[in-house]
Amino acid sequence: MRHRNHQHHLGRNRSHRRCLIANAMKALISHRRIETTLSKAKVLRQHADRCITWAKKETLAGRRRLIADLMVTFNSLTPKEARAARQLGDTSAYNDDRLLFQRLDRLVKDFKDRQGGYTRIVRIKKRRGDGAETCILEYLPVEEPEEEPAS
């Protein structure tokens, strides 16, 4: 029986949905915020929190899980070639594994003391063309500890 075995399909088949989630996750990790529809944001929030949790464990299995979920391709570009591609707006810049994992490690440092709930969804407006609810999915800002005034 398939009780409680529900998944949000987002109007796409399995391979298209997997690529959509992976590309949106790469953009979210790179920019810390993305604008998308509400239904996509609800699905991406689960994946974003799971990515941070796996990265925080710092195990080989966690690293491999991230590589598989984010569909990271290891390109053989030199740093100079990668920089030139990024300046030209080439999408292979998203597949730069070093850059992606550096930003992910920075997120892990920001959330090292937090036990989940790393993202938030802020609804903004309905899209003009089709009336879909749009929102901003973002990682929470880093809370700096407040210094107590010296008396």
Positions of PLM-derived features:
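Structured, basic alpha/beta domains of bacterial-type, RNA-associated proteins
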Residues: R2-H9, C19, N23-S151
